[in-house]
Amino acid sequence: RDVLGSRGLGDVYKRQLYNTFISELEYINKGKNQEVIDERTLFRVHQAISTGLVSDEESGYLRTRGVRISGTAYIPPKNLNDIRAKLNEILYQQEQYTNPLERAVYLHCNIAKLQPFIDGNKRTSRMVESIALMNADIIPVYSSKDADILNYRKGLIAFYETGDYSFYAGYFLDKQVERIKGIE
């Protein structure tokens, strides 16, 4: 079963993503720890996810060149200082969201939109979303179903282009409700 919805990745990358997820889960649950979501955590998570995917010089570090996102006209910032400033703003602004579901969506969408790394941004964003949820004892939910992947991407692209969270939040909440109904 593809727990993390890492479709299209090689087995090595799926295993890395899974191991990173399990490591975060164990840390948070061990002694009721709270994982602080800061720059250090973000870089550590990206490094764990991107090892072997990008060069060692780029793994766990902000990108220094431009990137493009397929399926959208949105172009993320290119300048390292702009990326760093926006990332600091995102990490600071997360404190405004006391509801863990809202915080998770906020962090995921904004980090994914910023594309702070050369590759692995959506995977890193989903892991940060998971950490925000696990900090509140909420089980993260992912799906590898084609329809869900399509809705996930549509929700993110809508956010990239409009700044409107509603499409992604709808997908996110539908997956949470589906999981809860499956438990009943």
Predicted regions and their residues:
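FIC/Doc superfamily catalytic core
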Residues: R1, G5-E184
